[in-house]
Amino acid sequence: MTTSVALDWVVQDGQRLAECRHDDPFSLLGPQSHEGQWIVRIWMPEASQVELLCDGRTTAMTTPNHSWIFEAALNQNPGRTYQVRVKRAGIVHEQHDPWAFHDEWMGEMDRHLFAEGNHHHIWQRMGAHLMEREGVEGVMFCLWAPHACSVAVLGELNGWDGRHHPMQRRQGGLWELFIPGFKEGTLYKYEIRTQEGHCYQKADPYGFQHEVRPATSSVVARLDRYQWQDEQWMRQRDSRNALDQPISVYEMHLGSWIHAATDEPYIELDGTPRAPVPAADMKPGARLLTYPELADQLIPYVKDRGFTHIELMPISEHPFDGSWGYQVTGWYAPTSRFGSPDEFRAFVDRCHAEGLGVIIDWVPGHFPKDGHGLAFFDGTHLYEHSDPRIGEHKEWGTLIFNYSRNEVRNFLVANLVYWFEQFHIDGIRVDAVASMLYRDYLRPDGEWIANEDGGRENTEAVRFLQQANHVLFQHFPGALSIAEESTTWPMVTQPTDIGGLGFNLKWNMGWMHDMLDYFELDPWFRQFHQNNITFSIWYAYTENFMLALSHDEVVHGKSNLLHKMPGDDWQKFANVRALLAYMWTHPGKKTIFMGMEFGQRSEWNVWGDLQWELLKHDPHKGLQRLVDDLNTFYKGEPALWKDDFDQYGFQWIDCNDNRHSVISFMRRESSGGTWLVVVANFTPQSHSNYRIGVPMSGYYQEVFNTDSSCYGGRNLGNMGGKNTDEFNIHGYEQSLELCLPALSVLVFRHDPKRSL
């Protein structure tokens, strides 16, 4: 054994470490070969004594260069598993040396793929990863911050002091450090010092778990523990074409569906109560449900309603409840409001076991300015554009991703793969696609920048969306990718290889606006607006449309669905029944927002929950039963969904009876030859001898009637069905003379086995 000596460069490096300005601690710390011997240097701020424990020997370490750099000289390589005994503030503990692990974590191919934007599993390298290295347990941290002067890991185990664990700069703007002793559940952040000397504390962009708001630290979490039970579901999903399946979606917000009392805590498996997460200050005494509680309550409820999918408004971690989840700071973490990532995995697993798909809202269009988030991440506009004319949504107070940067696109595309792979979700709905596609979205003249061709189209965002959808379907062919796109941008649901955006469904915003405008009218005036309810068919096959009555239509003074309707209470419910039945029989997949299924009477409030007490009353119970039966009927009739996106699947009988506000049409299914006749009367006046033409003679069974008394109607109808007459109308030689109840939709099926 030899003695350490004073070196000027070590003194200088020690000063840089103390000032948190060092980007290459491995050049100084850990085992260093020097003139035929090995010098072990330990960086231990504020320690009074350090001893090296190696090969069964204890060696006192000295501080010849800096009071916080402890050194010992050895005659042989100590390896990497040695420990140090540290005395600090009178407390002694033993630990392994972070700087003993010099080798790079991010490989050359990883760096290459990330730099070109094509590392679809980059989260397997970025973030905080629990691992064992040569028998030493700890956490590997990896961060992208190319313009930072220095980066350090802050955490519970180092007193949130950035001087303790400076990270090593690697190629490509990456920073790495393996810290022995950090465990699952450890809170941490990154301390980023900019070239200008400013210091920011940032949550991990790739963090797999974060603290419950208002706290903002990341949490070390394990990705490989949960044992999935949905192999059959996943195999079947990826083997079928989602577009020729029935899709009926219950859109909902986990935090405002139903609350529990704070004095009734969730009990963990070990019998201890979990600390409640308050719903909001506006509702004292209420707490949010946990993922396990939601699995017990929400899943049976949605299954009983007959929906095929649950759509969750954004559940990526977000600090502000009032953003509804659309201002994300934790892209790789389900929100901790409701529990752990594994508990969310179990929620999805349970959905699949009960036959329900899971769709999540995904928000790649913008992000908030919160100090712990992505904004100005390394002292530069790293994730966002520097020019606010292209990098900021002023009306929303959010920033726009710089889609021209490969690493930023990689962050988002890999995030998409992450949610499908790690959480087995079945689909995404991309929010506010129009805000991504147009550079002048919500911007006055002079406050936006034209593209390279002088146009308003955001070509960078277009290429990003195409890449994201291409990668998604490459990995998960049975997935759903739904665009909320409110303009007439062409080919939204066309494949990327022919110039489309690559989604497989698009919300039909035009249909939604036309329907609500029509149904809000006094029924007498509807005769002058028949085009509102028929126009959607003329463009129904230009995209793969999903019909949606979403959360956006029951907030901000727009009232609830029930109170949008004219007339007395009975007429309001009848109008809603007719609207929903027309929606379910119209071409396109279906989505409605929570509360609409039973007639919520107030606007949606993110800080409250639904008015479940209304189900004590018959009209609300009747509407809920209507939705139950609509879903059951819909799923059992291939004519209503098999050919949603083929013109063969729909045929008008008559769309021109403006005077009576009546429409009639057929839904058809090509492979099985089945078809249905749908007749809708959108006035409060019933008709006892209303005639429509039909293509075949025989008996037509009335298989659905929204005026049934079990739904709250008056039970008018056609006594179970009608025979045809040889009366030529609507271009058909055969016709039916029907009773049409007020504000109703009727569905008939031809029964060839029943004689005239």
UniProtKB/Swiss-Prot annotation:
Keywords recorded for this protein, A-Z: Carbohydrate metabolism, Glycogen biosynthesis, Glycogen metabolism, Glycosyltransferase, Transferase
Active site residues according to the UniProt entry: D431, E484
SMART domains recorded: Aamy (SM00642)
Catalytic activity: Transfers a segment of a (1->4)-alpha-D-glucan chain to a primary hydroxy group in a similar glucan chain
Source domain of life: Bacteria
GO molecular function: 1,4-alpha-glucan branching enzyme activity; cation binding; hydrolase activity, hydrolyzing O-glycosyl compounds
GO annotation, biological process: glycogen biosynthetic process
NCBIfam families: branching_enzym, PRK05402.1, PRK12313.1
The name this protein goes by in its record: 1,4-alpha-glucan branching enzyme GlgB
Originating species: Prochlorococcus marinus (strain MIT 9313)
Organism ancestry: Bacteria, Bacillati, Cyanobacteriota, Cyanophyceae, Synechococcales
Annotated gene: glgB
